[in-house]
């Protein structure tokens, strides 16, 4: 067996949401930049479509035909697929507007899970900081994953160009999201921590408005 996984493939891909209502959930604390999402497949009108679930099992969106095909091929080769949330965006078009986002996708041989997962975890940290490493590289890059234990590509990928009617809403982890993630790591109970923090923030705002004499 080779000591390097040359079958690795990494790329960024857009995903869309079913509706404006469900898409708005991406702005909540259960969908944080750098989080892992599960890729799974559904058959729709004879076509296989790759979908996404967050770490709480909630379906958040789906990929287009081209990306679905790439992921289906990786799945057919028994590769492990990891998806990390790269950003969340909103567009006015098509009417009445839609939430969408981008995932950093990694496909690799599970025999190399230790090295590959460590690399992907480092990329997740970079995404959380608002840094988008270029994950589409050749053999030399793959070899660095196995020879340099802390390696992350220095080359980065830009966000989509700003346009009228389009905005990136979330492209890094906020202070509050970092606190929530720390709570998750301590196994306190993800939902409890998330909602407790939100309640505290709302209460603080209400208190500040009250002190200002607004109510």
What are these regions (language model features)?
Residues 1-215:
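Conserved active-site motif detector
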């Amino acid at each position: 067996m080779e000591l390097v996984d040359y079958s690795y493939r990494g790329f960024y891909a857009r995903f869309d949401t079913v509706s404006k209502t469900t898409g708005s959930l991406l702005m909540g604390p259960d969908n944080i930049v750098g989080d892992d999402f599960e890729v799974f497949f559904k058959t729709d009108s004879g076509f296989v479509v790759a979908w996404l679930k967050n770490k709480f099992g909630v379906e958040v969106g789906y990929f287009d035909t081209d990306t679905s095909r790439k992921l289906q091929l990786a799945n057919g080769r028994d590769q492990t697929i990891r998806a990390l949330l790269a950003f969340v965006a909103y567009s006015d078009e098509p009417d009445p507007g839609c939430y969408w986002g981008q995932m950093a996708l990694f496909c690799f041989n599970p025999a190399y899970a230790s090295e590959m997962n460590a690399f992907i975890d480092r990329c997740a940290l970079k995404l959380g900081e608002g840094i988008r490493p270029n994950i589409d590289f050749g053999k030399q890059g793959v070899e660095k994953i196995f020879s340099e234990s802390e390696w992350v590509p220095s080359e980065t990928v830009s966000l989509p160009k700003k346009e009228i009617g389009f905005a990136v809403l979330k492209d890094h982890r906020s202070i509050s999201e970092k606190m929530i993630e720390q709570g998750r790591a301590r196994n306190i109970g993800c939902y409890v921590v998330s909602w407790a923090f939100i309640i505290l923030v709302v209460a603080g705002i209400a208190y500040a408005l009250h002190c200002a004499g607004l109510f």
